[in-house]
Amino acid sequence: IEAGTRTLAARREHWALAWITLSDKGAAGLRVDESGPLMAADTRAKLPLCHEQGFMIPDDPQTLRPLVMELALGQGYDLILTSGGTGLAPRDTTPEALLPIFERRLPGFEQAMMQASLAKTPTAAISRAVAGTLGRTIVITLPGSRKAVSENLAAILPALGHALEKLHGDPSDCGKRA
């Protein structure tokens, strides 16, 4: 290969995580957020993080969508995890808020989360969790319960580091890494 004919992207050593808990009661101070810190702890246990920041907001698409856009496109977070708003309650609108801004869906993550959840409980079938990219950020929506957060993250964390590397331009062949 001649010099200058190939651009190699360095593999990242650490990732920036933002987590967002959607809860009307939590945002009003009527409930302690347990899912948000759990998202951070579970992710930190499997991925090297250089920065993490958490948010508690009401179940409101007009609050969620601009926050995710700012975190991804304005501040350059690598990974955004949300908890809550993926069910069928009237104010569960997380998928509707985020699907219009996703550039690419990540159906493999969605399917892995659903499969893992259904293995534990049949009520997981009502989850509408989605995953996608926005710029160089992976955005994943998770159900609101601590149990579902851990189960869903356990299903996708083994592939998440590789997905982030690829999204950031890692040119190595999949399955042939040193």
Predicted regions and their residues:
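Non-catalytic beta/alpha edge segments that cap or flank active sites
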Residues: 1-178
